[in-house]
């Protein structure tokens, strides 16, 4: 007889809580938001503590590996560079092999990103292409899709420039 009484007690308490929430939705909303904020604050504190207390390990610097393809490079023709696509695609073998981090306590974090002169040259070409594209967009080249006949005396705005 004790089990049905507990079930009825749970049901009546649940109904009483539901009736209280329906009668006071503002207090329920306030408690809910306070709970969410407290949880986020607690998570942030634990994250900061775990980051600050994490042991600092020295990164191992692997022995520099020579790429067997680098010794058999053919000289590139300058005309071929112009025909290339604006994006340089890297294959699975062209990934960066080693990143060396210096962990000086007061100094800045320096990263050696490029492991060969070929990768450095490739990155410089890509950066130059991106700079040229940004400059083209900045100067506001006219949009050719909107250049139809507008009739006499009409004005049109193409891209960022105003044409009369």
Curated annotation (Swiss-Prot):
GO terms for cellular component: membrane. Belongs to the EVA1 family. Residues 56-110 are annotated as: Disordered. It is a single-pass membrane protein. InterPro entries: EVA1_A/B (IPR052461), EVA1_dom (IPR039500). It comes from the Eukaryota. The keyword Phosphoprotein applies. The modification Phosphothreonine is found at residues 86, 149, 157. Its main location: membrane. Keywords: Membrane, Phosphoprotein, Transmembrane, Transmembrane helix. This is Protein eva-1 homolog B. Residues 74-85 have a biased composition (Acidic residues). It is found in: Membrane. The keyword Membrane applies. The chain crosses the membrane at residues 29-49.
